[in-house]
Structures are given as structure tokens and as C-alpha cells.
Regions:
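N-terminal secretory targeting modules
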Residues: 1-70, 86
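Charged, glycine-enriched surface loops/patches
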Residues: 141-166, 183, 187-201
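Oxyanion-hole/transition-state-stabilizing segment in secreted/luminal serine hydrolases
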Residues: 78-87, 92, 105-144, 168-172
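Structural recognition of the beta-strand scaffold that forms the well-ordered cores
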Residues: 70-73, 93-97, 121-126, 162-167, ...
Length: 245
């Protein structure tokens, strides 16, 4: 059977609902909202990490306590943050990041990622929607809309809980899209400043650069995308004072 999964953002409500089979032509996942965005993705693509990462997230949610100080979620830069608990002690933190995450499949996996947790704050990072691969890449404006939808949903589900948005980092592997990353960061910064006190923009991009604005490659591992221990220390220096007050 073929179906379309639809994520609808109303003025004050966000919910998921399947469309009937006679309305569909192929397996698609559609994101729509009052901020006027519609994005269809193959369900097969959205579920590509079900066995590799999502299944583990589901299993961990059954044994981890619901109460926590901070939930970190997003893509592999979160998942690979091995010193997360030590870096933010004595806070209780949970790591809900998974490799390859995009805003598109984070909408699809929203309930799984959030699960039963009741955090006092969120920290979000994801940089996989802007790519040099045309089969994955989406326009900056479309990504901005998807981000707004995600944060609007969190505000409805977790009223008053701050969300720290980590700016998209520049890296050598994706240097060709640096201007687009900067554009997205600028849009998110302005949106956070204008929207509400719940979304806080954190510049985690500039600290990874040299004094002349170039990418500091000494802060990255060999793939030139992910941070090494020194790179994460730069993030901790910025984030820790915000989370531990």
C-alpha cells in the first residue's frame, strides 16, 4: 500500500495524519504549514537510518529517565560528542543526536527523538540539509521554513523551555557552500531575535575560525566535517555559561 504522511502546522497546533490511499501516487512525506512550506520526501529516504540509529534511540528511551536538564539533539556532531556528560556536569544531559540527520527526517522522527523526555532546555545542531550533492541539497529558504516549523512545534509541546540553536559550522569538506551556510545562520539569528525568548541563537561557527576568518582545520578530524576534542572544547566554552547559570 502506498501512503503520504502529512505534518501540518496550524496556528497553535501541530499534528501528524496519514492521507487516504486513493489520494496518493507514491510513498511521500509532506511537510505543510501556515508559514507556507510544502516539502515531499520519499519515506524510504526518510527511514534510511531506522536500523542504524533510530532503533537505538527508541531502545535508550525505555531505560533513560524522563527528567533531564538538557536534551542535545540533531545530527552527528551531536551524536559524536563523546564527552557531553563530563563537559556539562553537574547537569543531567541526554544525547538524542543521530548520524546523517536532516531537518526533513527530524520532522518525521520527531516523536522518536523527543520520546518521553522532559528537559529543562534543548540544544540543537544539524548541518546536513545544505550539501553539494543535488539529490540531498535543498534551498536555504526551504531549510529556514523547515527550521521554523520544528521550533514552533517545540514551543507548542514544551512551552517556556529554551532552545539553543547552534549555528551551522563552516568546514573544508563543504567550503563550496559556505556562503549558503552563512545565509542560513543569518536568517536563524534574526528569527531567534524577533520570534521569542524561547529560541536562542548561539554563534558556534566563528570560534572555529582563525583570526582572519578562515576555517581552523586543526579543530576538525580527518573527514574535515566533524570536530575533534579541541573543536568541542570551543563549543563548551560558549555553551556551558549559557546552560549553567
Amino acid at each position: 500500500m502506498k501512503t503520504i504522511f502529512t505534518l501540518i502546522l496550524a496556528l497553535f497546533t501541530l499534528s501528524c495524519a496519514p492521507k487516504s490511499a486513493e489520494q496518493t501516487q507514491s510513498d511521500k512525506y509532506t511537510v505543510e504549514g501556515t508559514i507556507t512550506v510544502s516539502k515531499e520526501c520519499d519515506v524510504e529516504w526518510l527511514t534510511r537510518y531506522e536500523e542504524k540509529y533510530i532503533k537505538a534511540l527508541k531502545e535508550r528511551a525505555t531505560v533513560e529517565p524522563a527528567e533531564c536538564d538538557v536534551m542535545f539533539f540533531g545530527s552527528s556532531s551531536i551524536r559524536l560528542w563523546k564527552t557531553l556528560k563530563e563537559d556539562f556536569a553537574p547537569l543531567t544531559v541526554v544525547n538524542r543526536g543521530y548520524g546523517g540527520a536532516t531537518l526533513r527526517d527530524l520532522h518525521y522522527n520527531y516523536e522518536t527523538v523527543m520520546a518521553h523526555y522532559k528537559p529543562k532546555a534543548f540544544v540543537f545542531y544539524c548541518d546536513n540539509d545544505l550539501r553539494t550533492k543535488p539529490e540531498i541539497d535543498i534551498p536555504v529558504g526551504e531549510l529556514f521554513d523547515l527550521a521554523r516549523m520544528l521550533f514552533n512545534r517545540i514551543e507548542q509541546d514544551y512551552p517556556g523551555v529554551p532552545v539553543y540553536f547552534l549555528a551551522m559550522k563552516h568546514c573544508k569538506r563543504r567550503e563550496a557552500i559556505r556562503d549558503r551556510q552563512a545565509m542560513y545562520n543569518a536568517l536563524m539569528k534574526e528569527y531567534a531575535e524577533r520570534s521569542s525568548n524561547q529560541l536562542i541563537y548561539v554563534d558556534t561557527c566563528t570560534p572555529l575560525q582563525t583570526a582572519d576568518g578562515e576555517i581552523d582545520t586543526t579543530l576538525f578530524v580527518e573527514d574535515n566535517i566533524h570536530l575533534n576534542a579541541e573543536g568541542y572544547k570551543r563549543w563548551v566554552e560558549i555553551l556551558r555559561p549559557l546552560l549553567i547559570k
